[in-house]
């Protein structure tokens, strides 16, 4: 929201509510620290990647990059998530064929992109419990979101920021902050990663750009350059649709129409009724819900992947934090076998 970027009249009007939000956050954190509220710790390292601000900043692409990095080292990695926006509240393992309505779009995307075990549950600690019971040789658990979910203890915390930084620096609803910043939260983070071009404060950086190709529902690829000159429609049901549209235009694509939809949007038949006979570009996150959906046969629906590439120093710092934690695991535990 643009209101969150400045301290205008609306933000000032909401400022008293932000103070109440801040007090509630501090009280909740104190209850967990004192042990009044239970916080679960597990026998393997837990990495939490999330946002201090509301809205997308690249958290899910980071989770996928973390999983791939750890898998490349031979580690068995599992992912847990609350599965925001899903219709079911049960704890379940996400498979390639799990309906997105049951898993949530982000867990479905992570599963398809990494093939790591992915579990969703209303309480993330329950998801970890099921993950470790099903895959006892798991070496590292990566939690998609959950910086503010203190019921799950973690060993490494990573916060992601885009060009908005912390916006106007105020708490919800007057600003974008989910918790006070700076302060104990900034000092307590292990790693900060900036996905924008202009980092607002110290931290590691990551490249974020579109792939050179788009993917059809059957898995075939088409170069973005081959789409120039076509009548194109772009849609995005993500936190910042305009960023996706801007990246498409930067690749030389002319968008006849753009459709900005709410994050985690549940697509209905009417959403794309005006796009019949056209080539429609969407994000991978939207594609997990749209591919195979009835009534879209008249569209050429293409997903454009996002290439997320943190700087090497980020992974070096992560490995340095993780090494002593992995050394405490039983010998050979958590490594993939050939």
Swiss-Prot record:
Binding site for ATP: 53-60
Keyword Nuclease appears in the UniProt entry: no
GO CC aspect terms: plasma membrane
Keyword set includes Membrane: no
Sample GO molecular function, one term: ATP binding
Reaction catalysis annotation: a lipid A disaccharide + ATP = a lipid IVA + ADP + H(+)
The protein's Enzyme Commission number: 2.7.1.130
Associated pathway: Glycolipid biosynthesis; lipid IV(A) biosynthesis; lipid IV(A) from (3R)-3-hydroxytetradecanoyl-[acyl-carrier-protein] and UDP-N-acetyl-alpha-D-glucosamine: step 6/6
Protein name as annotated: Tetraacyldisaccharide 4'-kinase
